[in-house]
């Protein structure tokens, strides 16, 4: 029987980000998903080019009953932090209209 420090259910954007964060902290991670391939929805977003973030992310663009939650969440992990992560992994991307960020290569 294997031992895992962290078990994550779901290989979508949040599950993969959570697994990467745990891995950076030297945790052994198991990600379980019902789909045969991880990140299925991410890979098809943006016509297969993966619209992975937006540089114009601001609290005023969100409709929410608790606007303080949005401010808090966005301040804890701003767009440029994810862009830094993408760049560290050598992924080429471009900025399109309205600040949308897309990978340059089609997802496989």
What is the predicted function of each stretch?
Residues 5-6, 68-72:
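Short, contiguous strand/loop micro-motifs
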Residues 6-11, 42-44, 95:
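Short glycine- and Lys/Arg-enriched binding-loop motifs that mark or flank ligand-binding interfaces
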Residues 4-31:
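N-terminal Rossmann-like FAD-binding beta1-loop-alpha1 element of flavoenzymes
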Residues 11-16, 47-49, 91, 100:
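Gly/Ser/Thr-rich helix-start
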Residues 21, 35-68:
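Conserved N-terminal glycine-rich FAD pyrophosphate-binding loop of Rossmann-like flavoproteins
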Residues 76-108:
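Feature captures the FAD/FMN-dependent oxidoreductase FAD-binding
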Residues 62-64, 73-78:
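Glycine-rich phosphate/pyrophosphate-binding loop regions near the starts of catalytic domains
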